[in-house]
Amino acid sequence: MIEFRVDLRSGVSPYLQLVHQVQQALRLGLLREGDQLPTVKEVVAQVAINPNTVLKAYRELEHEGLAAGRPGLGTFITRSLADSSLGAHKALRAELVRWIGKAQTAGLDDKSITALFADTHRRLTVDGVA
């Protein structure tokens, strides 16, 4: 089951953080079709946010066709976003882990590492040059 985290200082709405975390878990194959999401009560207890925030996130997931609420049962994943070849990329993951280690050794904090990766990825995909 997914464990949510909310960073109230991130500038990203808490409900969107929940939505993004579910989407990421779906892309990585950590959540699959038929899996049940935590109940609103469980999420509220876990991350100390308003129940309406969780409901808004779950409604957004339903709107995107990624989840469906079943009255009296909970909210369930309805489709996956996982790339079927993602599991075959263990070598890439290992290389990325090494790269992150080098970045940390160089003194970069998590936000700087994320920014560097995102900027490099954007330049490569948008501009065609890293």
Locate the predicted segments by residue.
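Short, Lys/Arg-rich nucleic-acid/phosphate-binding segment
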Residues: Q36-L37, G69-I77, L81
